[in-house]
Amino acid sequence: MTPLAIRKKRMKRCDYYMSMYPAESGIDAYKDTEKYPPGYVKFLMYGGDAKTIPGHIRIFNKVGDAYGFLTDAAYIVDFKNDIEFILSATIYTNENQTFNDDNYEYDEIGLPFLRNLGQAIYEVELERRREHKPDLSRFRFPDRDN
């Protein structure tokens, strides 16, 4: 078997877009930060609605929602504290057990749970001793990161 071969330039581009906040996309509709705040698709750590996210934190992720399931798979980087971790979670929030009725408890149960889970793991990572300091330079983008 051969390893996944992705050119560095393409990988950098993928990293760039996976960590982008809505207003950074260049798409006019996403410039409305009231409707699309920085945490809009950052379920872990921010529950999908953070008005501000510290400049030293970047979340490279992919989210999904369907039929009461909420999912976020994220690589979370904190440049100021030199920490990184991967976290993935899925929660089911379909209390009435009826699929495709658009009646799910995303806001009441799912997003707060994912936010709290991400923040709890982040707090553990802040305290965890590391034998080796991570090299996070690959994940810095001078045009937008502090």
Regions found by a protein language model. Name each.
Residues M1-N146:
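Structured C-terminal helix/loop/strand segments within mature extracytoplasmic catalytic/sensor domains
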